[in-house]
Amino acid sequence: MSGPLEGADGGGDPRPGEPFCPGGVPSPGAPQHRPCPGPSLADDTDANSNGSSGNESNGHESRGASQRSSHSSSSGNGKDSALLETTESSKSTNSQSPSPPSSSIAYSLLSASSEQDNPSTSGCSSEQSARARTQKELMTALRELKLRLPPERRGKGRSGTLATLQYALACVKQVQANQEYYQQWSLEEGEPCAMDMSTYTLEELEHITSEYTLRNQDTFSVAVSFLTGRIVYISEQAGVLLRCKRDVFRGARFSELLAPQDVGVFYGSTTPSRLPTWGTGTSAGSGLKDFTQEKSVFCRIRGGPDRDPGPRYQPFRLTPYVTKIRVSDGAPAQPCCLLIAERIHSGYEAPRIPPDKRIFTTRHTPSCLFQDVDERAAPLLGYLPQDLLGAPVLLFLHPEDRPLMLAIHKKILQLAGQPFDHSPIRFCARNGEYVTMDTSWAGFVHPWSRKVAFVLGRHKVRTAPLNEDVFTPPVPSPAPSLDSDIQELSEQIHRLLLQPVHSSSTTGLCGVGPLMSPGPLHSPGSSSDSNGGDAEGPGPPAPVTFQQICKDVHLVKHQGQQLFIESRAKPPPRPRLLATGTFKAKVLPCQSPNPELEVAPAPDQASLALAPEEPERKESSGCSYQQINCLDSILRYLESCNIPNTTKRKCASSSCTASSASDDDKQRAGPVPVGAKKDTSSAVLSGEGATPRKEPVVGGTLSPLALANKAESVVSVTSQCSFSSTIVHVGDKKPPESDIIMMEDLPGLAPGPAPSPAPSPTVAPDPAPDAYRPVGLTKAVLSLHTQKEEQAFLSRFRDLGRLRGLDTSSVAPSAPGCHHGPIPSGRRHHCRSKAKRSRHHQTPRPETPCYVSHPSPVPSSGPWPPPPATTPFPAVVQPYPLPVFSPRGGPQPLPPAPTSVSPATFPSPLVTPMVALVLPNYLFPSPTSYPYGVSQAPVEGPPTPASHSPSPSLPPPPPSPPHRPDSPLFNSRCSSPLQLNLLQLEESPRTEGGAAAGGPGSSAGPLPPSEESAEPEPRLVEVTESSNQDALSGSSDLLELLLQEDSRSGTGSAASGSLGSGLGSGSGSGSHEGGSTSASITRSSQSSHTSKYFGSIDSSEAEAGAAQARTEPGDQVIKYVLQDPIWLLMANADQHVMMTYQVPSRDAASVLKQDRERLRAMQKQQPRFSEDQRRELGAVHSWVRKGQLPQALDVTACVDCGSSVQDPGHSDDPLFSELDGLGLEPMEEGGGEGGGVGGGGGGVGGGGGDGGEEAQTQIGTKGSSSQDSAMEEEEQGGSSSSPALPAEENGTS
């Protein structure tokens, strides 16, 4: 219809006296869009009426009207169509033209008459009679169309003819749309006949469905073919309900019976593949049960006899099924959609919905658009769900109640989504009257963005409308429009809900993390079951959950270590550990709850909180599906972020690896009475806080959640978090898991401070699956799938534990030497600052004081000789000599230990391989067996390089090179293993610089002559070789290659700074660098038992012992002995356990060759400039012509300590000419930084003697070293006097 009616008359009206040729005139604009003079033709002047009856147009206006009608197609001014007006005006008065032009246009364009032939003359009587006949037929058709115009379309001030034509056009479009929908419906599903379903004849189908229709007189059944879209069967009740004969429906398209706006909803809800199959032998009872469970679709179906003035639509609830129907005996069965249609009555008419059942729920977006409407709203409001979806909420509220919505949303924000009741509001029903409803509201706070994602409303009708038939069409009135106040109010609410939610209540954040609102959010806020009681005040603290641990990890990774520490320090001090083991966490406004912070909740608080807590949790109904789904996906994401590492790090305090562990214990737990200060590791690990966990939600002696009791090392959390996504090697995966295995066993340990062997490690893991019973989500809510995932998550650790072959002999509580007793507050600052540094690529910030002495409450004892290699897991990482001495005390004799392995004077720390718990050397010098300030004698075992007077009386801990490579845990800058090659290239120049720092002595101590500092190096090499014969030697051959790569990559981390980095080792200088490093580098590659591939504790080596020995006690910080990483045991594991790249040792030449090949391969991926581009850039930037970095960037000075060591330049160095081609430049962030506070890797004092100077020399000149020379030197332990390393002033000290 639109086709022939659209267009414009290109030629305008014919000039007077000229014959008009309708055949050559293009189609004029659609009649409904014509501007026309005179009033509307709503009174419908008949075609035969003469003059201007009902039409005020004069004769002289006909031509102007014709012109406007032919030249204007877009002005729909609500008047009648120009076609009819010009037709009548031309009949009433003679126009200047012999033939009425507008009549010609009308006849030629709107009628299917035969006058498309050009008329011979304008006054032919036969032609005029034909036109009059066509015009009469046209008016008759229009009159009939107007009878079928729906009442709601007959608005005031609108032309009846225009509205009729517009409605006819809409109907045509709807028919076309129906066909398109149907084609999509049938094509999407492929061949429906392939579905396995029962086949019914029409008689069988009628017999089955009659049980429904007899039970409910407002129900009928209809079957629609999926192949043709036509009705193949309809029950007799359809004619009664729709007030028409049953035969009218046979063969008709079902979509043509639906209201146009419901056709898409119907097709979208009846996709064949998603429909339930109509079961064989479905009885009325069973079928009705299925019917109530199936997803229904609401549609309006046209009814009423043809003679009615317009179609009347009645609302029905359609429940679709899929089945096969055989129309006749010989015809094949065809798949059909069987619909059970139930008419919907107004809830206020008989049969009425009881007043206490007039409840429905809604959900709307922060911008106040309906997102979901409960189907129970249909009989109460008169709207079908699809009528409200996407519509503004405020549009349906009484104008006086709209401002209340702003207050409602403010309260939602204040209560963090908690359900609450609100005063009644008036909602406009479909019939135009208002329904008064009691409302309750709740908001869902997105756990990720902490913003209100959507608002849930629960509404109970209090007052019914005066007109109880809510489905009655409203009195014709202008369509509701968005008033300016509605728009403004919606914007205010939207801006309000853009704010993140802050709540001090654990249960305040509806759905954030595991702590979710106890209110029933799928039916929120009823006055009886979810009033604001819980929301108003902070709820009781919730038990620690695994999900909270995940959130802690996320917090640390993304918000920084300092914020993490501060959030942990906020809870009030708790006097002692509770035997109940209930550790509650309170959600801070922006921080996640930290279980381990509140290791010792006060008994009164815990007991008071626990009593009401459990009943509430049991009573609380689960949150909505959207909440659970959102949470589960987030938790799965967090679990994928290497959760084993994070969980492992919760055990920091037990590992005696870093003083920060116990520091943070003190810092977080607050002042702990001395009486309660049994060895923290003993108390925690022995299960004092973990074993007796009786909470029904968390479960008994579940171990991984027991980890929440452990104070963690802040540095460990930070470093591991920052590195967990980059480590890809065996060590970074396995040690965390095995650590957790060990922790699973810990709850079985006997309580008490005294060391006692723990029971077999296989005792505790069994309850572990209960550990992950969701605390916040409640058992009733979490899906079985999630529980299985969590159990599998734990089972991996248990399996690994069996692989490790743990036995009880190795699991011993921490000895007194672990320094878990009271620790002065001074040390806490180091934990914090150190944690912060290790967070930011572990570049030391010397501005943070690093000299506070921390007295150790533990009496001095002999060092810890490494336990046998067969020791079960906790002792797998051989303990290094523990610095057991008073911080400022004088030398204390240490009992000589034989070179062979001897039982540990101190029991092995339980969680020794906490690889991430490393404290950077610049904060805590590597532990030594000697008290501070006491010179160490070289030992047969790997001696600490700082020893001045050789004495073979010390036990043989594996020697730690003074310049050993930094642990990537603290300085990894690679985001994927593919970037390790690039990282090594960047790091290699830096690794040359700080090895002199490996020079003995921490900077605070007296600097011995350079000869003394260089002397021990050859011995160290020999000692290393001899030490390889001990329990540690099993892995030395295998790891030699890895350590060589360590030495090459020199991922200088503050934690693994070189020996001399003592208190000041920087990220750059931490690598093996230094004058007396030739032997040391060899040691580092041969005897160091840590590797960047395993995320080990580089600073755990005894390398820094000498640094401590030389440092004045006042400038030292006690550093716990760090043990070897767990991969030592892995070296003895089966070959298939190891990664493929752990091949037999390779020589340096092959390694360098492979590196160069990788660089060449990477070179192809570097951007290249054409010569023109180079010239153009060179004209602007001179450094482009030289192929060097700009002067502003080419700086090797220590950023943190302010040293001015500058790069002498490398314009002539072949390495950098090659780098120019690659587009690479060595990372020079660590320039003089290696010294940290003390300067170039020389510890606080700038390195020991010449060692310190050479450290500075190499730091300052690393930029100018040849890459090959640097790599070869690092691989082969090249001497520090490499010609590629010119000397420089020791300016960093």
Swiss-Prot record:
Record-level GO cellular component terms: cytoplasm; nucleus
Primary subcellular site in the record, as a coarse category: nucleus
Comp. bias intervals (Pro residues): 750-768, 856-870, 952-962
Compositional bias annotation for Gly residues: 1059-1073, 1232-1250
PTM field: Phosphorylated on serine residues by CSNK1D, CSNK1E and probably also by CSNK1G2. Phosphorylation by CSNK1D or CSNK1E promotes nuclear location of PER proteins as well as ubiquitination and subsequent degradation. May be dephosphorylated by PP1.
Any one of the GO BP annotations: negative regulation of DNA-templated transcription
Region of interest: Required for phosphorylation by CSNK1E: 596-814
Region Disordered, annotated ranges: 1-134, 509-544, 647-697, 748-771, 808-870, 935-1094, 1204-1293
Span of the annotated motif Nuclear export signal 2: 489-498
Modification sites for Phosphoserine: 122, 126, 660, 662, 703, 814, 975-976
Short motif Nuclear localization signal, span: 823-839
Region called CRY binding domain, residue ranges: 1145-1293
Chain ranges of the PAS domain: 208-275, 348-414
Regions that span the bilayer: none
Ranges of biased composition (kind: Low complexity): 48-57, 64-115, 513-533, 652-661, 1032-1058, 1074-1091
Compositional bias ranges of the Basic residues kind: 826-843
Keywords: Biological rhythms, Cytoplasm, Nucleus, Phosphoprotein, Repeat, Transcription, Transcription regulation, Ubl conjugation
Motif mapping: LXXLL: 1039-1043
Stretch forming the signal peptide: none
Induction data: In pancreas, expression exhibits a circadian rhythm in the presence of light/dark cycles.
Quaternary context: Homodimer. Component of the circadian core oscillator, which includes the CRY proteins, CLOCK or NPAS2, BMAL1 or BMAL2, CSNK1D and/or CSNK1E, TIMELESS, and the PER proteins. Interacts directly with TIMELESS, PER2, PER3, CRY1 and CRY2. Interacts with BMAL1 and CLOCK. Interacts with GPRASP1. Interacts (phosphorylated) with BTRC and FBXW11; the interactions trigger proteasomal degradation. Interacts with NONO and WDR5. Interacts with SFPQ. Interacts with USP2. Interacts with HNF4A.
Name listed for the protein in its UniProt record: Period circadian protein homolog 1
Lineage: Eukaryota, Metazoa, Chordata, Craniata, Vertebrata
